[in-house]
Amino acid sequence: MKLTLGEAARISGGRLVGGTPGTEATRVCVDSRRARPGDLFVALPGDFADGHTFVEAALRAGAAAAMVTRPVVDLAGAPLGPLLVVEDPLAALRALGAWVRDVADPIVVGITGSTGKTSTKDLLASVAGVRFRTVAAERSHNNELGVPLTLLQTSEDTEVLVCELGARGPGQIRDLCTYVRPQIGIVTNVGVTHYEQFGSVDAIVAAKSELVASLPEGGVAVLNADDPRVAGMAGVTAAEVLTYGLDEGAPRTARPWLSGEAVEVDALGRPSFRLVRGDEHREVRLGVSGRHQVSNALAAATAGLALGMSLDEVAAGLERARSSPWRMEVTERGGVVVVNDAYNANPTSVAAALGTCAAMVPPGGRFLAVLGYMAELGV
């Protein structure tokens, strides 16, 4: 992202105070501890802290300006600046993100689902990066704040942008899609994550299908054939539908467009499998842990093929992918293997993690699970 403070003021509907319109901002930052020269620091209000408190620290770190909702002074009462004064920081970020997305004009892949969004995002970023200049969401940036921040990572040479799209209520994914405008959409699965907010699995299905329904006629919907609720979303889109799934001998009405076969898992939980598309196949050994990662890899592979990549390129990208921190993160020291999957939890992901860990225990070994509370399940 590169834009002048004058452009930022015009796009966001804000007012520049104490700055030069031609000064260039090269990055958006919402954490003053990570501020660096050239940043536009956004002072967000929060439940535990107000970003306006940290404007001075961000400017001292070299930030080009701070986006605020009111004038800010230092401890001596002197006005701080440059400031970009806006009414609503989230609305301003959304406007800036939409503008940068339109200027960069990459191919945008949106990913949603109850579980597997971040892992699929990491796998797809690695796959697309084999051929394309690719930008992907950091960590789990998938809401009304994280999605604009992801868009603002792009530049004019970005070819593929991978976005996570989350929801805690009806209409949220549809709203995100109005300015993300994905051409490819992936739905990983439907489970009971955020059941408390939705009230029923049917409502969760409807929310996740908003991504598929938002795709253009020339787009591609990538759907999990192993989840009937996801496969059923084919009926709500004008886009081409490509399915993926595991071929484990169970009867099917139709073979997935892309399938995974002969899954095996090594001592550290890392799966290998055969990637099959029509008469072609490639052997793939993942660098991430968990048998469930094969489904995420198939989703990423299908999207990679939809981007025009070869099966060889896709396989190479899958093999070099690594997990985000705290997501089935495996470390080994002194004969003890620690699997850190503490970023978030829901019944589906916990069952997958426990299954992976149990399979890693050698004969005579022990398996200890440290489990926390799972929220937003409506129970």
Spell out what each predicted region is:
Residues 90-225, 229-237:
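Phosphate-binding loop of NTP-binding sites
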Residues 8, 39, 58, 96, ...:
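Residue-level signal for inorganic ion chemistry
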Residues 12, 62, 78-80, 130, ...:
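Short, structured coil segments at secondary-structure junctions
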Residues 30-31, 43-45, 68, 136-138, ...:
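Thr-Gly-centered strand-to-loop micro-motif
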Residues 69-77, 186-337, 364-365:
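Acidic, Mg2+-coordinating active-site environments of NTP-dependent enzymes
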Residues 46-49, 324-326, 342-379:
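Active-site beta-alpha connecting loops in nucleotide-dependent enzymes
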Residues 1-95, 99:
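N-terminal leader/targeting and accessory segments in enzymes
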Residues 33, 56-57, 174, 202, ...:
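Alpha-helical segments flanking ligand/cofactor-binding loops in enzyme cores
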